[in-house]
């Protein structure tokens, strides 16, 4: 419980700073990473020497693993590495890399990667909603139809005009999608709905 509440508070701060200033600050992510490792280290010690059934619901370390500390570090490394590849390949910011590495440290490998995928799906959906909001559904459908007609006429990929490309250069806000993604994965929100 403590781990999930702390993670959601950190994500709330990251969401605010990302939307307001387009930055996810180190003072949010680094202490979060350390807190995740500390909580999971306590979980490892309690599993070895203490009353795990009493303390796991309170602290909320990574469940169902023999060594929560190792799971935390593995999640941190894996999620951070995947996002580092995205940083090099795509236009993902460094704050997003650290944010998702922090998620991996809190959630472990499996839940961290699933949360990251949910964030990308929700971020893409949010981007599409913003695109429709800015351009309008009718105008967007006309532009897509015109582009598809050009592609079919040429028989190969046709570059978008600069005017249309400008709409696609919107930033991908991952921090705002992190909260619903964590709720979906950690608390099983979709399980409640279906």
Language-model features and meaning:
Residues 1-92, 97-194:
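A membrane-topology feature that recognizes alpha-helical transmembrane segments
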